[in-house]
Structure formats: C-alpha cells, structure tokens
C-alpha cells in the first residue's frame, strides 16, 4: 500500500562495523546492519570499489539499495560489533510457542554453565486508510520487541525465557534453581530486566 510507514525493520538503519569470525578465525571487518523483520544480516566489505554508495537523509554515505549481500546463514559464523563488542550469531531456539527454528541472537553473558541472549524481534502491522472523516488513517507500523533466551552450555538449543521468575524452572538446570532464588532474593533482582538477568547468569556461571 502507499500509506506512510512508522518505524523500521532494521535494528539500526545505519551500517556499522563488525568483525566476522568463522570457527573463531577472523574473516575481516565488514559493514553490517540487521534486518530483524526478515532476520537477515546485510553485509558489505569496506573498500570494495564495485559497491555503489549514496547519501542518506543524515548525510552519511551508505551502500545503495541492493548493493549489500546477506551474511551466510551458518552457525559457525559469529559477527562481533566493533563498537559494543556484542556478538550476533545464528542459534537454534525454541520460541514462546515451543516451535524449533534458527534465529539471530545477541549474546549478553556467557560462561561455563549458561549463555544469555536476546532477540530483537520486529512485528509489522498494516495501516488502514480512513473511509470517512470520522475515522483517522493509521500508518503501517514496525514495532520492536526484546525476547530473552537462555542456553545450557551442554545443549544446542537456547530456550525462550518469559521474564517471569516462575518460568526459570523451564530454562535452568534443576540443581541451579535454589542458587538462582538466593541470588534474586539477595540482590533484589528483577528477572524482566536485561541488566539483572546478566547479573543472575554471571552468578550462576561462577558455580
């Protein structure tokens, strides 16, 4: 449709620098951006003279439409953001509905027992044109959501975590539940907070 669109399918519309690793071996620095709606990572090799660049609305030079390629969708590839140091990789997940699939996850904390990730998930709602003057036209809208996933490090799958304390029993090992309760109570952690979840997982990785 030709209605205006609010929001973006991208985590960040601008291309930023990230180092790409294959089986922990560096393949070099690339410009990348993550289309979280399609769950696709677009990459461009800096200095590639065949790539056409255009000026965006902010005056930045960015690769023209169709000039980027997709990062290979294999689990051995990890992309590390040069600015934040945060890793992005393809991981097998069970989502909120229990369905098994692969998705790009951002690593928040990692250690000997658990890895904590978040997924930047994007929903799209089509706008509606006003049929009369009593009703307002609503634009198309992209909305971003943050979902947490926890992987036991002896398993391949990262499990969806709702953020509710009672649901920790579905993502943690039985023997760690008591320790988790003690950490949450002792440090007054909120399990829906990214910062507090990082503290919890780092504590559980000390055991």
Can you annotate each of these PLM segments?
Residues 1-10:
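Sec-dependent signal peptide cleavage junction
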Residues 5-6, 17, 25, 29, ...:
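Generic hydrophobic/packing signal
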Residues 21-163:
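Aromatic-patch recognition
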Residues 159-207:
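Long, compositionally biased interface segments
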Residues 12-19, 114:
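Short, hydrophobic/aromatic-rich segments at coil-to-beta transitions
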């Amino acid at each position: 449709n030709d209605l205006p669109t609010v929001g973006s399918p991208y985590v960040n519309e601008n291309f930023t620098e990230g180092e790409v690793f294959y089986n922990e071996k560096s393949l070099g620095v690339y410009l990348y951006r993550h289309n979280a709606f399609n769950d696709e990572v677009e990459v461009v090799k800096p200095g590639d003279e065949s790539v056409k660049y255009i000026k965006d609305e902010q005056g930045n030079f960015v690769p023209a439409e169709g000039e980027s390629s997709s990062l290979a969708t294999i689990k051995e590839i990890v992309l590390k953001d040069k600015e934040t140091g945060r890793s992005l990789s393809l991981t097998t997940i069970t989502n909120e509905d229990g369905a098994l699939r692969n998705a790009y996850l951002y690593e928040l904390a990692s250690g000997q027992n658990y890895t904590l990730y978040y997924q930047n998930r994007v929903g799209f709602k089509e706008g509606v044109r006003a049929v009369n003057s009593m009703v307002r036209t609503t634009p198309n809208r992209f909305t971003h959501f943050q979902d947490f996933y926890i992987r036991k490090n002896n398993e391949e799958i990262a499990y969806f975590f709702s953020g509710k304390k009672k649901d920790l029993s579905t993502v943690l090992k039985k023997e760690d539940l008591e320790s988790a309760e003690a950490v949450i109570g002792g440090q007054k952690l909120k399990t829906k907070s990214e910062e507090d979840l990082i503290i919890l997982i780092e504590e559980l990785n000390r055991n």
